[in-house]
Amino acid sequence: MTAIKLIVGLGNPGAEYEQTRHNAGALFVERIAHAQGINLVADRKYFGLTGRFSHQGQDVRLLIPTTYMNRSGQAVAALAGFFRIKPEEILVAHDELDLPPGVAKLKLGGGHGGHNGLRDIIAQLGNQNNFYRLRLGIGHPGVASMVSNFVLGRAPRAEQEKLDASIDFVLGVLPDIFAGEWNRAMKNLHSQKA
């Protein structure tokens, strides 16, 4: 049972990307920081916004890379390397085209599925892909050629409300995630209705 020591929220930096679908992971980490009453601060050493809190005596670090999505691994590798955090102690939250809005799923390992942030993290961790992923459903535009504009666009209010509700649900299973109770966390999360 592996406890999580680092939670990464993927997104793109800058006000123009703040509320876009591609920043679902960053939104998740912001919500954790708010719930824990901590501020995320810019740290050039780790190429991102960072924060730290303690859960039952265990340090948990938060990271939102301030690199663009396709360089997210630079931030993850810098922070994980400095604090000697193993890939299996990392949870990466990211937007997921293959899940509808309002659905969130946990997964250990696997490929990048075309997600440039995951692709770079895997590469920067020395081709190790055995980190946990929180896949936050954003839906799919239906046509591959529309994906880029879709993920970089803002979700309509109804879709955003579903994403917010799924993040709230995940926040409720965080104690299991922090404790390394992955089977229980997955069972609870995967029984959620969109």
From Swiss-Prot:
It is an enzyme of class 3 (hydrolase). PROSITE patterns: PEPT_TRNA_HYDROL_1, PEPT_TRNA_HYDROL_2. SUPFAM superfamilies: Peptidyl-tRNA hydrolase-like. GO terms for cellular component: cytoplasm. Its EC number is 3.1.1.29. The keyword Cytoplasm applies. The active site is at residue 22. GO terms for biological process: protein quality control for misfolded or incompletely synthesized proteins; rescue of stalled ribosome. This is Peptidyl-tRNA hydrolase. Monomer. Belongs to the PTH family.
